[in-house]
Amino acid sequence: VGTESISLSTGTEKNQTYASAAAVNSKGIVPNNKYNRYNFTVRNTTTFLDDKMTLDFGASYILQNDQNMTNQGTYNNPLVGAYLFPRSNDWSDISMYERYDAARKIYTQYWPVGDEGMVMQNPYWINYRNLRQNKKDRYMLNAGLSYKILDWLTVSGRVRLDNSNNDYTEKF
């Protein structure tokens, strides 16, 4: 896992600005598994009209790419087969997770253990043949404007936009 971040904050009495960028890059302990996330944020707050009006706006962008994140439950989860793999068996036997079936003219999954009523599959097959990729793009924008009419009365308005796009691919 690698995490990197940088931020910048600057300002005066009437104007403050903040910007940051961060990245998380990791490869899981499950083979062929990875997660990458990048965050970018900027925010500015300023006052004017003798400090009676305040304008605050910000923007964030998040890009996330992941591959073969472990499914929950028993279906398509490599951990189920790994946990229930008989101790008397040898892992090197199943690391060659596919065999060529001449009659069908395709490679088929090699999993001599069976499914034990739990839809178990060879963990290597799941990680190298049942590929899942996910790409998420998200951006958020916000702005606020307030005006101090009297010392005890302020009028304010805010707007926020949150938009995301998710592109998910699963290959069997």
Specify the residue positions occupied by each region the protein language model found.
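Surface-exposed loop/interface segments of Gram-negative outer-membrane beta-barrel transport/assembly proteins
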Residues: 1, 29-33, 39, 43-138, ...
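Outer-membrane beta-barrel channels and translocator barrels
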Residues: 12-13, 49-51, 148-150
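An active-site-proximal structural segment forming one wall of the substrate-binding cleft
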Residues: 153
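Short strand-turn segments of transmembrane beta-barrel domains in outer membranes
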Residues: 1-7, 17-33
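Outer-membrane beta-barrel architecture
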Residues: 7-9, 20, 43-45, 142-144, ...
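Non-cytosolic beta-sheet module surface loops
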Residues: 9-10, 22, 160-161
